[in-house]
UniProtKB/Swiss-Prot annotation:
Cross-referenced Gene3D superfamilies: 1.10.150.130, Intergrase catalytic core (1.10.443.10)
Gene Ontology biological process terms in this record: cell division; chromosome segregation; DNA transposition
Domain Core-binding (CB): 14-104
Molecular-function GO term, any one: tyrosine-based site-specific recombinase activity
Entry protein name: Tyrosine recombinase XerC
Any single Gene Ontology cellular-component annotation: cytoplasm
Chief location bin: cytoplasm
UniProt cross-references to SUPFAM superfamilies, sorted A to Z: DNA breaking-rejoining enzymes (SSF56349), lambda integrase-like, N-terminal domain (SSF47823)
Pfam families named in the record: Phage_int_SAM_1 (PF02899), Phage_integrase (PF00589)
Domain called Tyr recombinase: residue spans: 125-311
Keyword Cell division among record annotations: yes
Gene that produces this protein: xerC
Family: Belongs to the 'phage' integrase family. XerC subfamily.
Length: 322
């Protein structure tokens, strides 16, 4: 269950705390942000208001509207001095801009200072895909057969991971599938509501269908048509954390690095498709990326992989005069 920042933990006047609570509710229910993002945005706002309080400014709505660009730059500088990464600073600024837009929509005024502050530059980290054999193995229940867990739990985890690698889903998208939409039998496509409320159609290949069917055949809990396809041991919605723990177990069994995460399976889906001459636009549609530039990161991954293999295999690679 989502634990957003309680209004009483925010510094500031009551009207500001109420506005913050309403904003977080909108992010969750209307914008459909992930639980982690809503929690992070609430934390970013709390840290900013605490910074204003330390600086002597009253953290209320009029004070926010009257902010100067230097106030925001001082906050960013203070956070950077604390060792906060550029990526986290960029998210904090996005959170403040989101809250400012909420205040504007509610008639509280425009926080114009935010438009004068640039987002910090962040070097885009290349995704780290898994080797094909490792990705396939992670989606197999046989790898964890020795664990003291019910067979249906192992089958469930394998089905979720098969959807991540075999269909390129985000973990939240896989766990959001309803029972009546389970890709089994004649159902070989999924309608996925992804980031930004964008809907996309995703084909489901036979091995993924088989993994889901295997799970359904052994799941001991009743699964109502409009309820979640994947459930926990007590029959409630499956938590992403449980999937992350399953992947951690698989990392140990397969000897994989810490970068082998559930999201790495989605990266692997894209990179392996591209390596097989997949069309970049088609991969963009399958992943649900709003921008082709986001998908083009995988061309860099594939090029880097090929160059690395060349450097390792060719005796004169990288040498002067080669």
């Amino acid at each position: 269950m989502l634990q957003t920042t309680p209004p009483d933990l925010l510094l500031g006047a009551p009207d500001l705390r109420e506005a913050a609570a309403a904003w977080l509710a909108v992010l969750k229910t209307e914008r459909r942000f992930s639980e982690n993002t809503v929690e992070a945005y609430g934390r970013d706002l709390r840290q900013f208001l605490a910074h204003l309080a330390r600086s002597g400014a009253a953290p209320d709505i009029p004070a926010l509207v009257a902010l100067k660009p230097r106030d925001l730059r001082a906050f960013m500088a203070a956070r950077r001095a604390e060792g906060v990464s550029g990526r986290s600073l960029m998210r904090a600024l996005a959170a403040l801009r989101s809250f400012a837009r909420h205040l504007d929509r509610e008639g509280h005024g425009t926080v114009s200072a935010l438009s004068a502050v640039r987002s910090p530059k962040v070097e885009r980290r290349l995704p780290r895909p898994l080797p094909v054999a490792a990705a396939v193995a992670m989606a197999s229940p046989d790898i964890r057969a020795g664990e003291d867990r019910p067979d249906w739990v192992l089958a469930r985890d394998a089905a979720v991971l098969a959807l991540l690698y075999g269909a390129g889903l985000r973990i939240g998208e896989a766990l959001g599938i309803r029972r009546k939409d389970a890709p089994v039998g004649d159902i070989d496509t999924l309608t996925i509501l992804g980031k930004g409320q964008k809907t996309r159609m995703v084909p489901v290949i036979a091995p993924v269908q088989a993994a889901v069917a295997d799970y359904l055949a052994v799941c001991p809990h009743p699964l109502p048509p409009d309820g979640p396809l994947f459930v926990g041991q007590k029959g409630g919605p499956l938590s992403p954390r449980i999937v992350q723990l399953a992947v951690a177990s698989l990392r140990g069994a397969l000897g994989l690095p810490d970068s082998a995460t559930p999201h790495a399976l989605r990266h692997s889906f894209a990179t392996h498709l591209l390596a097989r001459q997949g069309d970049l636009r088609a991969i963009q549609d399958l992943l649900g990326h709003a921008s082709l530039a986001t998908t083009q990161v995988y061309t860099k991954v594939d090029s880097a992989r090929l160059l690395s293999a060349f450097d390792a295999a060719h005796p004169r690679a990288g040498r002067p005069g080669g």
